[in-house]
Amino acid sequence: MNFFIKLIVFLFIQGVLQLTIQEAQAKKLTFVRDAETESGIRALITPLLQSAGLDNDSVNIYIVNDPTLNAFVAGGPNIFLHTGLLATSGSASQLIGVLAHEIGHISGGHLSKLAAAQKRASNEALIGTILGGAASFLLGNPSAGSAIMSGGQHVGTRNLLRFSRTQELSADRAAIRYLDASKQSAQGMLNFM
């Protein structure tokens, strides 16, 4: 019985930690507003959005004041570009390649698919935990239970990583299609990524 109490506490703490991590990440973002930069990025992204069949006004661009080399899509059709990415881009074609990749995530519906993949991975880990707890209790062998729990977590993590790699490859392929359709070179994307 003691094991099940620990399990419930563990799952509760995991949920609280996840919320805390998400809140902390959201609060850390500070944005840069610069009309000239935003206008330039919008000019670069417009042909790509047209190639992807997306409405230019439906995609928002945010510049995040962060020196790291990063870009991501979050919260719907929102592209976040770190200032570090903008500073590090050696050419417009490199930035265009990154933008095309992020548009690939949006047009592929990867955010909604990610939520489903995370839920599956969480369920796989939870099933492993429940089976491990049951095995530990029924067999009287905590080591066997721990091994099953670890296996369930490993399966969930591995499947989520596989999903992530698939989505990244899909976004890259879409980016190349959008670059070709808008008559832009993919060389910057290939050099930068």
Language model features by range: what are they?
Residues 6-18:
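Bacterial N-terminal signal peptides
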